[in-house]
């Protein structure tokens, strides 16, 4: 039977075209340490030029979750790849690691070359923001597993850090200052609840602007996750950072304690930073309690850094010079967990 594979739902020619289209985007991410080109069985990266006493490789892998469903609904696929990169590289930079390279995995029901190109275009943009090379990936066409409009997206990154410079959080003490770096919005966590609250129960339209939002709801929800790699690496060159937390699923409540010793807690000052209107809209439409919001979403802070009190103002200044919005949002205390002081945040 001629074209048997195509009749089974797998279009090899479309796959070849997708690879051809993505090459120009991938090329923009290359670093001098990358060996070989796109299309090999494995990606290669030369570590011989890194002048580190005890080099340690740090790896991370993650996906975008159900934020993908918003991309399907809006038929917008050119930024979702930034989210995939951000979720991985932000996780390893909190340990002091410089991301070196990234690999992606795209699984789809139907390989549409233009859509695949847009996804990889976003991945490449994320890699450029993080300074890492896109050295490989897999695009799997799986008819019957996914509908023709659906795909899943995941990524994997590897970074490097000198062993003595790994940021562990183990030396954090009571009295250290917590500095928050602003998020771009919801980032890539909590979208199952977002869809239920705003789209299913609230029946809001992706095309309309609600409340204090400055963009249509769909554009607001698809804002890419902020990548903090370059400002954090710059910070690590100049100041001692005792701990860092990437605020992802579990919000403040789960993620800040991940960087703290067992006997140390965090005291957060509500009102010390601006919380974006999208979170107010979510709480209002979903009638969600404030504590639940902080247990699910980043609430306007995508990264938290712990430093000495005497360095805090200078650290904020450096981060602002790097283009970040940074605020002192609290401090570490004797105890455990995360507590909140001040008035209502939303």
UniProtKB/Swiss-Prot annotation:
Keyword Nucleotide-binding attached: yes
Annotated compartments: Cytoplasm
SUPFAM superfamilies registered for this protein in UniProt: PurM C-terminal domain-like, PurM N-terminal domain-like
| Principal subcellular localisation of the protein | cytoplasm
The chemistry this enzyme catalyses reads:
2-formamido-N(1)-(5-O-phospho-beta-D-ribosyl)acetamidine + ATP = 5-amino-1-(5-phospho-beta-D-ribosyl)imidazole + ADP + phosphate + H(+)
- InterPro entries in the cross-refs: PurM-like_C_dom, PurM-like_C_sf, PurM-like_N, PurM-like_N_sf, PurM_cligase
Can the keyword Cytoplasm be found in this entry's annotation?
A: yes
- What is the main EC category here? ligase
Q: Provide this UniProt record's keywords sorted from A to Z.
A: ATP-binding, Cytoplasm, Ligase, Nucleotide-binding, Purine biosynthesis
Q: Which GO terms describe its biological process?
A: 'de novo' IMP biosynthetic process; adenine biosynthetic process
Q: In which pathway does it act?
A: Purine metabolism; IMP biosynthesis via de novo pathway; 5-amino-1-(5-phospho-D-ribosyl)imidazole from N(2)-formyl-N(1)-(5-phospho-D-ribosyl)glycinamide: step 2/2
**Pfam families tied to this protein:** AIRS (PF00586), AIRS_C (PF02769)
Q: What is its EC number?
A: 6.3.3.1
Give me the Gene Ontology terms describing cellular component: cytosol
- What GO molecular functions are on record for this protein? ATP binding; phosphoribosylamine-glycine ligase activity; phosphoribosylformylglycinamidine cyclo-ligase activity
Q: Which domain of life is it from?
A: Bacteria
Q: Which family does it belong to?
A: Belongs to the AIR synthase family.
Entry-linked NCBIfam families: purM (TIGR00878)
Q: What is this protein called?
A: Phosphoribosylformylglycinamidine cyclo-ligase
What species was this sequence derived from? Bacillus cereus (strain AH187)
- Lineage, opening ranks: Bacteria, Bacillati, Bacillota, Bacilli, Bacillales
Q: Which gene encodes it?
A: purM
């Amino acid at each position: 039977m001629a074209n048997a594979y195509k009749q089974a739902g797998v279009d090899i020619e479309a796959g070849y075209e997708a690879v051809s289209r993505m090459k120009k985007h991938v090329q923009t991410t290359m670093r001098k340490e990358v060996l070989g080109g796109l299309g090999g069985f494995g990606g290669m990266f030369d570590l011989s030029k890194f002048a580190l006493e005890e080099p340690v490789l740090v790896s991370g892998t993650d996906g975008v979750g159900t934020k993908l469903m918003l991309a399907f609904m809006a038929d917008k696929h050119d930024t979702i790849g930034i989210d995939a990169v951000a979720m991985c590289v932000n996780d390893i930079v909190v340990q002091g690691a410089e991301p070196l390279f990234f690999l992606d995995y795209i699984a789809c029901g139907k390989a549409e070359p233009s859509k695949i190109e847009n996804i990889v275009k976003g991945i490449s943009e994320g890699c450029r923001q993080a300074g890492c090379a896109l050295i490989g990936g897999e695009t799997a066409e799986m008819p019957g597993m996914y509908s023709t409009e659906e795909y899943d997206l995941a990524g994997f990154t590897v970074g490097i850090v000198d062993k003595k410079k790994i940021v562990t959080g183990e030396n954090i003490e009571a009295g250290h200052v917590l500095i928050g770096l602003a998020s771009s919005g919801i980032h890539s966590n909590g979208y199952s609840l977002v869809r239920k609250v705003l789209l299913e129960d609230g029946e809001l339209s992706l095309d309309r602007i609600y409340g204090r939002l400055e963009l249509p709801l769909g554009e607001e929800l698809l804002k890419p996750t902020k990548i903090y790699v370059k400002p954090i690496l710059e910070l690590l060159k100049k100041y001692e950072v005792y701990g860092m937390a990437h605020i992802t699923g579990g919000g403040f409540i789960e993620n800040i304690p991940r960087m703290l010793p067992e006997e140390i807690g965090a005291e957060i000052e509500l009102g010390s930073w601006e919380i974006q209107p999208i979170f107010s809209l979510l709480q209002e439409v979903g009638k969600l309690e404030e504590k639940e919001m902080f247990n699910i979403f980043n609430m306007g802070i995508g990264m938290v850094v712990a430093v000495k009190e005497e360095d805090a103002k200078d650290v904020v200044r450096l981060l602002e010079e790097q283009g970040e919005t940074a605020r002192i949002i609290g401090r570490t205390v004797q105890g455990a967990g995360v507590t909140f002081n001040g008035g209502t945040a939303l």
